[in-house]
Swiss-Prot record:
Role this protein plays: Mediates the nuclear export of encapsidated genomic RNAs (ribonucleoproteins, RNPs). Acts as an adapter between viral RNPs complexes and the nuclear export machinery of the cell. Possesses no intrinsic RNA-binding activity, but includes a C-terminal M1-binding domain. This domain is believed to allow recognition of RNPs bound to the protein M1.
The gene coding this protein: NS
Main subcellular localisation: virion
Note, other: Average number present in a viral particle is estimated to be 130-200 molecules.
Motif Nuclear export signal, residue numbers: 12-21, 85-94
Protein name: Nuclear export protein
Protein family: Belongs to the influenza viruses NEP family.
Top-rank taxon, per record: Viruses
Record-level GO cellular component terms: host cell nucleus; virion component
InterPro entries: Flu_NS2
Entry keyword set: Host nucleus, Host-virus interaction, Transport, Virion
Subunit structure of this chain's protein: Interacts with protein M1. May interact with host nucleoporin RAB/HRB and exportin XPO1/CRM1.
Species, as recorded: Influenza A virus (strain A/Hong Kong/212/2003 H5N1 genotype Z+)
Entry's Gene Ontology BP terms: exit of virus from host cell nucleus through nuclear pore
Localization annotation: Virion; Host nucleus
């Protein structure tokens, strides 16, 4: 994973953890947890692509990797919709900028995961 993406994830997670939303903080904590999970999943897919032949060990280790991949895309779509919703309702510029960056990062990560998964297929 490139260092800009790592710092983008870290920056957004730190900024989101500092935000106090009018709605429940559980919602935001859930988003943060999903961002972290998504980052780890994307990293592991990227590492699998980097190692030649690792696809076979990935299949042996986890025969349901396609199902996991599908679930991750569902999570990404949910996060994108949640971030878009937050963008529509927020009036705070700090929150707006944070959610804009989160949306951009989600779209980039979705594209990277798609690229990794096509290489594994």
């Amino acid at each position: 994973m490139d260092s800009n993406t790592v710092s983008s994830f870290q920056d957004i997670l730190v900024r989101m953890s500092k935000m106090q939303l009018a709605s429940s903080s559980e919602d935001l904590n859930g988003m943060i947890t999903q961002f972290e999970s998504l980052k780890l999943y994307r990293d592991s897919l990227g590492e699998a692509v980097m190692r030649m032949g690792d696809f076979h060990s990935l299949q042996i280790r986890n025969g349901k990797w396609r199902e996991q991949l599908s679930q991750k895309f569902e999570e990404i779509r949910w996060l994108i919709e949640e971030v878009r919703h937050r963008l529509k309702i927020t009036e705070n510029s700090f929150e707006h900028i944070t959610f804009m960056q989160a949306l951009q990062l989600l779209l980039e990560v979705e594209q990277e995961i798609r690229a990794f998964s096509f290489q594994l297929i």
